[in-house]
Amino acid sequence: MKEDIIGLFQETVEDTSSEIPSIAALLRINKYDLDQTVTNELDFILGAVFSQIINRFKIYSTNRSMKISESDLDELYLLLFSKAEEFKQLILKSTNSS
C-alpha cells in the first residue's frame, strides 16, 4: 500500500479521534431517546466513530484524487477495527464512564 494512502488514513483517524468527546455528547442528548433504542452506549458510539472515520477518509481521498483499491480498503478497515479498544478507552474517558 502506498505511504501517502496510509498517511492520509492516519490523519483521518487522528482528526476523528480528537472529536470523540463531541460525537459522544451529541449521541447522549436525551431528546433523541437513543437510550430506548440502543442498549450498549459504548458500542453505539464506537460505531459512530468508525462511520465518521470511514466517511472522512473517503472525502479526504476523493479531494486528493486518490484511487484506493478494494484490497487497500480491506487492509485499512482491518487497521481501523484493530483500534477498537483504543477508541473505547477514549470514549470512556470522554463520557466519564467506567
Give the ranges of each region predicted by the language model.
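Amphipathic alpha-helical interaction modules
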Residues: S18-Y60
